[in-house]
Regions:
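Cytoplasmic-entry segments and transmembrane alpha-helices of multi-pass inner-membrane transporters
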Residues: 77-112, 136-143, 151
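Periplasmic/extracellular loop-to-transmembrane helix junction in inner-membrane transport proteins
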Residues: 2, 28-72
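Short cytosolic juxtamembrane segments of multi-pass membrane proteins
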Residues: 241-255
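Hydrophobic alpha-helical transmembrane segments of polytopic membrane proteins
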Residues: 204-241
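Short cytoplasmic-facing helical segments at TM-TM junctions of multi-pass membrane proteins
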Residues: 134-137, 141-182, 207
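Hydrophobic alpha-helical transmembrane segments of multipass integral membrane proteins
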Residues: 13, 17-21, 54, 58, ...
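Loop-to-helix entry region at the N-terminal start of transmembrane alpha-helices
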Residues: 55-63, 113-134, 177, 218-223
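Transmembrane alpha-helices
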Residues: 124-128, 161-193, 221, 226, ...
């Protein structure tokens, strides 16, 4: 197996090794399934409750995608405004940083009061926790446009808007796709956290229900499903990134 193939398969090799070690430790030390279930127990619970898990997983998925979609729109618009103006960058960026430092789980009770139990708090929590990386990366890509390049374009007759749209935004695409891969995982976290306290369905609700009934295998199966959905979306954005912004990674690919 050459280096490139090994690099491609390395995550799966590591995953299999971790699962095998996990199973070995649980079997060797007779770990209680009520404390730390083995991979085999998690699989049996997953298969037994696969229909129920699928229903909760679908709810978590589409709610996450709704919040994530809003985050993309708001993040790109805010990032464009902040990155295209020094005044906006100086005025808005510190406030957004302070807002991002607030624990998003603390917003869930407030959102429940405003919107009630259901999809509203989950969608908004997914949005609140995931828009910041998108905004920051778009703003960074625009704000770090080389002054020399901008001067040359101005000499050639380009206006400020032309520079931002035709040069700044394409240059920001690697930053944008990088932010999507981070933001989508955060969106799943936000949805799951909200569902644990403000929903009657979804993987977060399943985790609370399984934990309260001491079904640790089912709870871990729910966690695995969330991780799998996040990983699939991450790989999807990675594939799109490689096909659309391969020029930005040619140096690392050749190395």
């Amino acid at each position: 197996m050459n280096h490139r193939k090994f690099e491609k398969w390395s995550p799966w090799i590591l995953l299999v090794a971790v699962v095998a070690l996990w199973q070995l430790i649980c079997s060797a030390f007779n770990v209680s399934e009520f404390i730390f279930p083995s991979p085999w127990r998690i699989w049996t619970q997953f298969w037994e409750f696969k229909t129920i898990i699928a229903g909760h997983a679908w709810r978590t998925f589409w709610v996450t995608m709704a919040g994530f979609g809003i985050a993309i729109v708001v993040g790109v618009l805010l990032g464009f405004v902040i990155g295209s103006s020094r005044l906006a960058y100086a005025a808005v960026y510190p406030l957004m940083t302070a807002f991002n430092a607030l624990p998003k789980a603390a917003f869930v009770p407030i959102l429940v009061v405003w919107f009630g139990i259901g999809v509203g708090p989950a969608i908004l929590t997914a949005f609140l926790i995931s828009f910041f990386p998108i905004m920051v990366n778009i703003a960074t890509g625009l704000a770090t446009l080389e002054p020399e390049l901008e001067d040359v374009l101005r000499v050639l007759g380009a206006k400020r808007w032309d520079v931002l749209v035709k040069v700044g935004l394409p240059r920001s695409m690697p930053y944008f796709y990088g932010s999507l891969k981070v933001a989508i995982t955060l969106a799943f976290v936000g949805t799951t956290v909200s569902e644990m306290t403000a929903a009657n369905e979804g993987i977060g609700y399943l985790l609370i229900s399984a934990g309260s009934s001491m079904q640790m295998g089912l709870a871990f199966a729910g966690l695995v499903v969330v991780g799998a959905m996040a990983m699939l979306m991450y790989e999807l954005f990675s594939a799109i990134e490689n096909h659309t912004t391969g020029w930005a990674h040619r140096g690392s690919q050749n190395g």
